[in-house]
Amino acid sequence: MNRTVNRLTTIAGLACAGALSMTTLVQAQQVYPTVDAKLKPTADAFYTSPTSGELAAEVPGNVLRYRALPAASLGTSLKEGWQVMYRSTNTKNQPVAMVTTVLIPKAAPATGRKLLSYQSFYDSLTLDCSPSGQATSNTLLEKTFFQSALNKGYIVTMADYEGLESQWIVAKNSGQGVLDGIRATLRFSNSGLNALTPVGMLGYSGGGFATAWAAELAAGYAPELKIIGAAQGGLPVNPINVAKKVDGGFWAGAYLGAVVGLSRAYPELKVEDYATPEGIVAIKDIGTRCLTGSPNLLTAYAYKKGSDLLKDPNFLNLPEMQAINRENTMGQNTPKIPLQIFQSIGDQVMPIADVDSLAAYYCANNATLEYKPVAGTDHVLGAMGLSGGLTYLLNRFDGKVAPNNCK
């Protein structure tokens, strides 16, 4: 009799604990009013991070708050759209908050939904150029690259993977931000998804960087995700090699912006200490700009040289810069998922030799890889490869055998 009572008491206790856990989770998912499209993200309280203590109490990928996108920003193919803030982990292994945009099309089936994680090439040092901000203001030109997925009924999630501090070109912060954005979308009650939902990842340039790092980190950081494949192109495999290639050219802003972005993730790199007086002014200004929006980084710093703004002409070769670069250079883990890499041979920003080496590393470590070097294009036109990348992923969703041209 006593054993029966004890057993019933234990079961009741576990049920209460489970109920309390569920209640806590629901309470953490605060509902905010619909997005005010007139507010820029830098002036919007939704983007204010919870405290470090509040973040530490959540597991990676947990939803913290969410709100609906205004009807005017949805377009004809969408049933609803949401901004979701979630808990992630930065390069220093500290809990941080990030935001993803979840788009649910009218064509989405009631059950058996599939998820495309699209990584924007927003390359920004300000939240105002973030995918979530651009989706609200209808300035996100990249929607053309995943519109056909929406038309087929796929849910799309689009993380602000640089985080609330706009840490541009930071490997773990970006890759883990993507993976936790996927987790958050699966856990978001309005998405109609669950832990068994198949996921594909797609991105180009800065978005390719985030996609590639998510693929490299997935097995160790988020092994439970059912990722069917990743397609990425325009890859900045080695950030310092990219900086050296663009220094003094039209794309020079990418070098200077990357230095500022990395310094936000590595506060021990006090970049102002290395700057000339002109450089100190430029660093502050660069921190308000982005590559694909306004105020624009490329046009403001085209044809500038690092030596114009930094005291040491060998700044990129300094031991502290080389150490940071090693942490943010691809090819540290071989993804366990099928991959496609598409890369312009004539890319004026990303060294093709670095991408060749990355593909060779993956192949040598038994990756399933379709590597597609493309002639006759540059970095801008190379983005057209996203169409083929999406087709690659749709074939993986359909269960077709992944191509592999590793020799």
Predicted regions and their residues:
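Primarily recognizes the serine-hydrolase "nucleophile elbow" in alpha/beta-hydrolase
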Residues: R183-G253
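Short beta-strand/loop motif that positions the catalytic acidic residue
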Residues: P335, Q340-D347
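Conserved alpha/beta-hydrolase "acid-adjacent" motif
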Residues: Q348-D354
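Alpha/beta-hydrolase active-site loop
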Residues: W168-N190
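Catalytic-loop region of hydrolases
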Residues: A28-P109, C363
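Accessory cap/linker subdomain of secreted extracellular hydrolases
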Residues: T34-E54, L235-Q332
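Histidine-bearing beta->alpha loop at or near hydrolase active sites
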Residues: G346, A367-G388, Y392
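Short beta-strand element of the alpha/beta-hydrolase
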Residues: T101, T111-S124, A230
